[in-house]
């Protein structure tokens, strides 16, 4: 996320420093966004408006504890969907959140203008600053609480991470028979469009919703015969859940 955020922000904002545990990574990104890489928090320029922490959730507490020693008066925000504002605010007075609800892969560019951005802060003036900053990137900016943001993060795991794993399983099935996975692309895109334009429950189709036991059993047998007990287990669980949801 740090790479994408820095590149997006540099077009309208000056980025002063980049820090990473790996100085080489910091230097590479700093070169891209015309900033100065540093190898220690004490080297960070204290005369800045904002510091962003874009690290793993478990690293946030230790990072903010170290940062506040050198930047006691600077607004510091994290970019996590699942970490409460209090993780920062209990350690630093001027704390905030700047969370983009998006999936990031280094090799893919992001359409920031349509990416929802969620901001939160301990002080109203800082909240407005974050709102203004977010609006420089996206048309969809929201002031959400930590609890609301966490619910979105949980929902995103279902909508993004789990669905992508389903695509992975689908590819494994067709790869085993030398069938081109791209043949499923129109189906995948139509499913996503229907789910975003309608109530997903009302758009459910398939043998589990119809409770077509002949098809369900045939698919299960195919997976068992292919020695894919792992896929058979997922198929059975999801079919059961869909059937119960529509019974």
Model regions: which residues?
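Internal alpha-helical scaffold of NAD(P)-dependent oxidoreductase catalytic cores
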Residues: 25, 29-32, 109-155, 159-196
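NAD(P)-dependent Rossmann-like dehydrogenase/reductase catalytic/cofactor-binding core
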Residues: 182-247
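Hydrophobic/aromatic beta-strand patches that form the interior of the parallel beta-sheet core
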Residues: 19, 38, 52, 77, ...
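NAD(P)+-binding Rossmann beta1-loop-alpha1 motif at the extreme N-terminus of oxidoreductases
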Residues: 1-40
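Short, polar loop motifs at secondary-structure junctions
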Residues: 21-25, 80-84, 124
């Amino acid at each position: 996320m740090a790479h994408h955020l820095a590149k997006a922000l540099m077009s309208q904002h000056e980025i002063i420093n980049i820090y990473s545990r790996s100085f080489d990574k910091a230097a590479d990104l700093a070169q891209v966004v015309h900033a100065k890489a540093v190898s220690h928090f004490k080297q960070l320029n204290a005369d800045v408006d904002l510091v962003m922490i874009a690290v793993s959730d478990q690293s946030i507490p230790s990072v903010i504890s170290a940062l506040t020693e050198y930047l006691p008066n600077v607004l510091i925000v994290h970019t996590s969907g699942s970490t409460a504002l209090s993780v920062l605010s209990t350690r630093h007075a001027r704390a905030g959140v700047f969370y983009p609800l998006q999936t990031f892969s280094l090799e893919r560019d992001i359409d920031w203008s349509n990416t929802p951005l969620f901001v939160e802060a301990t002080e109203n003036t800082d909240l407005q600053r974050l709102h203004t900053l977010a609006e420089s990137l996206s048309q969809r900016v929201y002031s959400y609480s930590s609890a609301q943001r966490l619910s979105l993060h949980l929902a995103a795991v279902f909508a993004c991470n789990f669905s992508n794993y389903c695509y992975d399983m689908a590819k494994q099935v067709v790869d085993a028979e030398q069938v081109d996975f791209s043949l499923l692309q129109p189906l995948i895109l139509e499913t996503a469009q229907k789910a975003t334009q309608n109530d997903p429950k009302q758009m459910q189709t398939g043998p589990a919703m119809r409770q077509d036991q002949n098809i369900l059993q045939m698919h299960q047998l195919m997976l068992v015969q292919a020695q894919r007990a792992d896929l058979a287990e997922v198929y059975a669980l999801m079919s059961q859940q869909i059937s119960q949801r529509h019974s």
